[in-house]
């Protein structure tokens, strides 16, 4: 049993709606099923971001409490890697107007973003307490 999305839930209109989608999609999985989702991730600012609109940008402060909530509910969430990387291409940012066909990081408004992946396994059985 498996759910997957690539750069989609940041287009639901707000940070809150994106996180709600992640929680609700778990209901479609059987116990022990897996969900893998990627989204835009703000690496330049953990305070200010695009919180609503056509594209939102998630921050560590949005992701971490959500992950802790999932774990508290008994789901497994793979450890997240927030490192920026150490290779030369990790330090290149595709700025507006976007010219590079391939990029690891790009500018959206005043923010530098990359993709982050969430790997979630639905709890294997229902809790009775």
Predicted regions and their residues:
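A conserved beta-strand element that flanks and buttresses the S-adenosyl-L-methionine
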Residues: 4-7
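Conserved Class I S-adenosyl-L-methionine
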Residues: 46-82
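A short glycine-rich, Lys/Arg-flanked "PGG" loop and its adjoining helix->strand segment in the class I
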Residues: 18-34
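A C-terminal cap/extension of S-adenosyl-L-methionine-dependent methyltransferases
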Residues: 81-129
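Short "lid" loop at the C-terminus of a central beta-strand within the Rossmann-like core
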Residues: 40-45
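A short His-aromatic
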Residues: 11-14
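Conserved acidic residues
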Residues: 1
